[in-house]
């Protein structure tokens, strides 16, 4: 394997503010970290137009039945998995609709798999195993912007006509160049040199939050700022569903629960029933007619 040159990467540079990190008092140490973390939001802000473009493109593909794949290694891969697994309970997405792939497979989430991220063939193999097609979206995540696993995945995605997005934390990287829609949240040197689980990881999480949340908002999974497609799979989420219906209908918890019971726990239908005073079957028809949009269903005559 050829020698890797990391000297040009901002994420690998020494942070001049923390060259004496081990000598700082604990308060000064965490203050330095907090000060550096403040820069993350600014790095993401600079990329908002690109992030918005990616959200719209992802939503358009998913509306036609496409899937969203996050692909990364190490921390980047784990962040993709983390975002993907939250989509089913939050938006009633299927486990197929948003998937997180990490170099080395599921076991690499808890323990690093030696050499997996350095392979340009594992990424294509992982995507091929999931039947990647032209309707799908692949988001390549790599703080460094040079991870071979991600580069291979993006190249394969392009070859089958899938939309490609990159989320990186260095400017002018190979991963960004390999994607149709690159997002470069340049966070600079880490407090601990090269530890991209810190600022770069935080920036990546913020971007992924926007990509998935924004896409599902565009897919009518949200009404106002209410999580109206929540899956009521545990006590906390059942209680949240009651509160959501209560907020949307402007009713007490008792009536909200009754509406949910009438609608077999479907929050969207319960809101339409409560607001329009229609039967659950009519509410479901209105929602189906208006592509799942609570707002449009409520506005319908």
Model-derived regions, located:
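Gly-rich Lys/Arg/Thr-decorated short loops/hinges at beta-loop-alpha junctions or inter-strand turns
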Residues: 11, 32-40, 100-111, 223, ...
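A short, well-structured juxtamembrane/interface segment
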Residues: 46-61
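Active-site pocket-shaping loop/turn-to-helix segments
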Residues: 49, 111-112, 232-234
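Aromatic/hydrophobic pocket-lining residues that form π-stacking "cages" and hydrophobic walls in ligand
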Residues: 57, 153, 211
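Glycine-rich phosphate-binding loops that contact phosphosugars or nucleotide phosphates
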Residues: 69-207, 215-219
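Short, amphipathic alpha-helical interaction segments embedded in low-complexity terminal/linker regions
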Residues: 210, 215-301
